């Protein structure tokens, strides 16, 4: 188990236990996704919260002003604990681990899908249904990213399984088979 995952797991497990007890796991999971998106996209926020120069009290105050109205108290308490213990550098790992544990406890599979272009709602529903039938779990969560280098089609990653239905993948496979034939 990687060191960061070892550090993140106890915090994530504690948060899941608290949110399950308060019946707010679904809300907190959605808030974790939103917070991760902000954390990943805002270098200024990340730099400020992970700076050793800022005191934990200042970090807690800033987090409270930024997020208090938007997140559940249990998630805010986690952020404050991480700030107190100088562990905000691991925030993304803790949130990702929480989401993993949340999905595990709810029997939800995560499928990473790369598409050449954005999918319509109908295409997304059809893709979700197809992936769900392949996986066989209770439900599937789709993490969709646009990758123009695929030219057309999509690539699905579910755990260690990869399904490449992209045009670039077909061209690559055709090139390999032609190279073998010559």
Swiss-Prot record:
One of its GO terms (molecular function) is proton-transporting ATP synthase activity, rotational mechanism. Disulfide bonds: none annotated. It comes from the Bacteria. Keywords: ATP synthesis, CF(1), Hydrogen ion transport, Ion transport, Membrane, Thylakoid, Transport. It is found in: Cellular thylakoid membrane. Its main location: membrane. GO terms for cellular component: plasma membrane-derived thylakoid membrane; proton-transporting ATP synthase complex. It is a peripheral membrane protein. Belongs to the ATPase delta chain family. F-type ATPases have 2 components, F(1) - the catalytic core - and F(0) - the membrane proton channel. F(1) has five subunits: alpha(3), beta(3), gamma(1), delta(1), epsilon(1). CF(0) has four main subunits: a(1), b(1), b'(1) and c(10-14). The alpha and beta chains form an alternating ring which encloses part of the gamma chain. F(1) is attached to F(0) by a central stalk formed by the gamma and epsilon chains, while a peripheral stalk is formed by the delta, b and b' chains. F(1)F(0) ATP synthase produces ATP from ADP in the presence of a proton or sodium gradient. F-type ATPases consist of two structural domains, F(1) containing the extramembraneous catalytic core and F(0) containing the membrane proton channel, linked together by a central stalk and a peripheral stalk. During catalysis, ATP synthesis in the catalytic domain of F(1) is coupled via a rotary mechanism of the central stalk subunits to proton translocation. This is ATP synthase subunit delta. It comes from Synechococcus sp. (strain WH7803).
